[in-house]
Amino acid sequence: MFQLNEIRRKLYHQIGYKDIISEDELSVQDWDGICEYKKLSEEFIREFEDKIDWVIVSRNQTLSEGFIREFKNDVFWHYVSGCQILSEDFIREFEDKLTWRYISEYQNLSENFIVEFQNNIDWHV
């Protein structure tokens, strides 16, 4: 199993997703590999939203705030909090969905914002 996964990983790095998509059937593992190892456009993710793994996409793909908003019920907020670049306005809008430990550790926050959300900030990171 490990060798097969390693081979797939190398293939994903070497060929574009359009070449892979031409196959009639893709396994869950194939879709996971595509989501993890290929840079996907939001258009591609939108087109195959029912096939992709949203946990992997939320962690490994670069998503715009508008796209995250559009798919707010699909994205994995834990990874959005730490792996996406978020504006303070976006963080305010979705403060109840976000993981504040990762917001505190990975987002670039102004002093005013930190004061405003001092009760949410994880001071131990």
Language-model segments: which ranges?
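Alpha-helical scaffold segments
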Residues: M1-V125
